[in-house]
Amino acid sequence: MDERNPIPFSGKTGFSHFRWFIVALLFFATAINYIDRQILALLKPLLDTELGWTNEQYGCVNSAFQITYALSYVVFGWFIDKCGIKTGYCVSLTLWSLAAASHGLVGSARGFLIARLGLGLGEGGSFPSCVKAVAYWFPQRERHLAASIFNSGANVGPILAPAIVPWIAEVFGWRMAFVLAGVAGFMWLALWLPFYSAPEKSRYVSAPELDHILRDQDERSNSAGPVNWWGLFAYRETWAYLLTKFLTDPISWFWLIWLPDFFYKTRGLNINKSWIHLVTIYSISLGLSLLGGWFTGHLIRRGWSATRARKTGMILFALCVLPVPLALKSSAWVAVCLIGLALAAHHSWATNLYAVASDTFPKRAVAAVAGIGGMAGAIGGIFFPVFAGWLLDQCKNTAGGESTGYLILFGICSGVYVVAFFVNHLLAPRFEQVKMD
């Protein structure tokens, strides 16, 4: 489609910066994406009373999202490679916005499960689209920063949601919170459709900016022809990426799904009181994750190899998560700081991985690899919410109550990144571009 068949450049002369407008669009789409995901978690205490579901049932509803999310990650990876980023993201966002709004039409655990299946089906196209867009629109040295900017939407969404969802639910009812989230997606499409194209085709990109974008993208010579999806599994780099995502992606889902419940069950804070804690957590995460995104790019600009810079970042981010179990034994605001640091480390880790995918595979394969990795992460996310819900139900009647369950879960979250680092390093000691047939 248009990303793969450039037409002659428009001839604009001054140095433009339109690539940053593109990454801003990706940022806002990611923020909307995460608002849609988080609304259910924020309304859980209210829906607990209305629906009478158990923690395990709530976990199953969220696992339903992960099932279709895992499948659609791969489907959209293929679809985006075939039809282009613009069309692929348009279809993805249309599907998930309709599904988000449909949550406001249901009134049972089964109804929410069906709505979550639809949401997962649409949202699987988001990150493959973003990763491939960054690969097309940014030179290597800027990709990590660009990825950290769009991925920071995963923090901004959860900052905005606790601040506005409780108010909407109180004034207009909880159903309207879901409906308005769906409307926001269609508003974003009104900007995406007229402004997005490949940089070679964009009338908003000047010749100097286009030269800058293409300056070190020598993998274009390795980017002709279709992607052999099964063939990707022959590369150790693919396995390194997908296993790392399988281990660490479920941790991000855990925070998103269970944090409002954590503050309610362990601190007695309902959403009208805990929203400020949640906003602060994601604000900390946003600021520090942008710093993390800058950090590895800074090392590369100082002359470090991509391998050395990205692996240094990965191990530092992994170590930052280790103290998070102390949140169970600390004051509410110390817990906020520890969880915020852990979330920032996760998002810095994640943006590092997105940049690694862009560095190690030619652009024609980036969306496919991102899709495979996203599927692996979502498969991990299928099981972890059910396990978390089951564990919390089992601990409910013990002496420590659900706090004991959360202590175990926080312990799992703290150690998995170190394990993932060594798995990744064993399979991919160096991040060098794969030469594909």
Language-model features: where?
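Residue-level signature of mid-helix packing/kink "hotspots" within the transmembrane helices
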Residues: 38, 66-74, 124, 158-159, ...
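Extracytoplasmic gate region of multi-pass secondary transporters
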Residues: 40-41, 233-292, 346-354, 381-389
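Helix-breaking motifs and short loop linkers at transmembrane-helix boundaries and internal kinks
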Residues: 52, 84, 105-111, 122, ...
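Conserved MFS/SLC helix-loop-helix module at the cytosolic interface between two early adjacent transmembrane helices
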Residues: 71-110
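C-terminal ends and interior cores of transmembrane alpha-helices
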Residues: 94-107, 315-330
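Cytoplasmic helix-loop-helix junction between adjacent transmembrane helices
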Residues: 115-155
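Helix-loop-helix hairpin linking two adjacent transmembrane segments in secondary transporters
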Residues: 153-203
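Multi-pass alpha-helical transporter architecture, strongest
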Residues: 188-196, 324-329, 411-437
